[in-house]
Curated annotation (Swiss-Prot):
Family: Belongs to the RecR family.
Native source organism of the sequence: Synechococcus sp. (strain WH7803)
Protein name, per record: Recombination protein RecR
Record flagged with keyword DNA repair: yes
Alphabetical GO biological process terms: DNA recombination; DNA repair
Domain of life: Bacteria
KW Signal (keyword) present: no
Keywords linked to the UniProt accession: DNA damage, DNA recombination, DNA repair, Metal-binding, Zinc, Zinc-finger
Molecular function in Gene Ontology: DNA binding; zinc ion binding
Matching InterPro entries: DNA_Rcmb_RecR (IPR000093), Rcmb_RecR (IPR023627), Rcmb_RecR_Znf (IPR015967), TOPRIM_dom (IPR006171), TOPRIM_RecR (IPR034137)
């Protein structure tokens, strides 16, 4: 990277590796950090390391959590009869922003994608089936991205869960191939309200 000393170029390169950060934004972030007091930079670095070492996954739903069980699973006010299945925690957080869903979640950790070498065994599908079979789950709502991988995963999961419970999929006002986490709250609310049974 021309015009920058090696340590600064290295910092810019690290920022560019983050999703959604291009070269110009990476430069702005790096230059901004260099203008901050050393104490603030140390605090930033400590927070980053603490998040990496202290945040794991909930043993029940596999959402990000610093405890063995996440806040959502521990909340007694959540509806126990519904489980909303999402690909990752970003999708869970997007749905939580709508305040339309008061049940529990299950984070798969991705989508079935044979082209990328991701099969059902690499996802949290078997733990979902065990969870649904062991509990009195009235409905499983599949809230997976409308894509080939999302559809494949939805069909696979629905086939495994139908012997145990009702399975539905959220309605989509989203274009095929779009990502759930980028949808606005109104679209996500309507999608939850308009869900339908998986045939």
């Amino acid at each position: 990277m021309s015009g920058f000393t090696r340590p600064l170029a290295r910092l810019i390169d690290q920022f560019e590796r983050l999703p959604g950060i291009g070269p110009r934004t990476a430069q702005r972030l790096a230059l901004h950090l260099l203008r901050q007091p050393e104490e603030q930079i140390r605090s930033f670095a400590d927070a980053l390391l603490a998040a990496r070492t202290e945040v794991g996954h909930c043993q029940t739903c596999h959402h990000l959590s610093a405890e063995p069980t996440c806040e959502i699973c521990r909340n007694p006010e959540r509806a126990n009869g519904q489980i909303c299945v999402v690909a990752d925690s970003r999708d869970l957080l997007a749905l939580e922003r709508t305040r339309e869903f008061s049940g529990h979640y299950h984070v798969l950790g991705g989508l079935i994608s044979p082209m990328d070498g991701i099969g059902p065994d690499l996802l949290q599908i078997s733990s979902l089936v065990k969870r649904v079979a062991a509990n009195n789950t009235e409905e499983v709502i599949l809230a997976l991205t409308p894509s080939v991988e999302g559809d494949t995963t939805s069909l696979y999961v629905a086939r495994l869960l139908k012997p145990f419970t009702r399975v539905s999929r959220i309605a989509y006002g989203l274009p095929v191939g779009s990502e759930l986490e980028y949808a606005d709250d109104v679209t996500l609310s309507r999608a939850l309200e308009g869900r339908r049974a998986v045939e």
